[in-house]
Amino acid sequence: ADDVKGLTGLTAAESEELHKHVIDGTRVFFVIAIFAHVLAFAFSPWLH
């Protein structure tokens, strides 16, 4: 029952694994974006 493929052609287990990678990538992107905004705030006239 667990090897039933959905619309994407992935099994439930494969989808969950892929989702973990997507979430990890989003978190990394978020951290980099926050860091970039802090630098932009510190080194530019933005909001000063």
From Swiss-Prot:
Residues 1-20 are cytoplasmic. Its main location: membrane. Residues 44-48 are periplasmic. PROSITE patterns: ANTENNA_COMP_BETA (PS00969). A bacteriochlorophyll binds at H19, H37. The chain crosses the membrane at residues 21-43. The keyword Ion transport does not apply. Antenna complexes are light-harvesting systems, which transfer the excitation energy to the reaction centers. The core complex is formed by different alpha and beta chains, binding bacteriochlorophyll molecules, and arranged most probably in tetrameric structures disposed around the reaction center. The non-pigmented gamma chains may constitute additional components. Belongs to the antenna complex beta subunit family. This is Light-harvesting protein B-800-850 beta chain. The lineage of its organism: Bacteria, Pseudomonadati, Pseudomonadota, Alphaproteobacteria, Hyphomicrobiales.
